[in-house]
Amino acid sequence: MKKSILFLFSMLMTLCFAQNSQKISEILENDEISKGQAAYFICVYNSFGEEDLSEKDAFDFLREKSFFDETEKSDEKISLSNVCFLIGKSANMKGGIFYSIFKSPRYALREFKSLGILPQNVEPNQKVSGSEFIALLNGFEKIAKKGE
């Protein structure tokens, strides 16, 4: 399991550099990324779609897979707890007992805190910048490598 997570995130980072530089520049320039932007990167990283996939199509695909609720919209800003949930769910994160049972953004955030990826004092509803999003992906990859 740990090897598959490591492999997944190795592929994620490889794909990050292979992606359209315009998309990467676009996300890094944002102070607050949208759910559609996060969905796009999760889909491309996990080979759920091609680089030419639109943010809306990526969001709709992940919504069908229960990553998002039916009431959520792709242009809404994404919260820190939802980013943790997207990353964890896309990597099939095992997590602690509560995350294993409930598989919710709340417990995904708590898992990221317990793994040391995030400090204990972060707020679940705070918005995430593009650079923070990439740092969370990178932080999760480092933890996955250590656990191998």
Model-derived segments and spans:
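Sec-dependent N-terminal signal peptides
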Residues: 4-14
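Prokaryotic Sec-type signal peptides and long signal-anchor helices
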Residues: 11-13, 65, 137
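Terminal recognition/anchoring or ligand-binding modules at protein termini
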Residues: 18-37, 42-52, 71-148
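Acidic helix-start/capping segments at beta-turn-to-alpha-helix junctions
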Residues: 55-67, 76-80
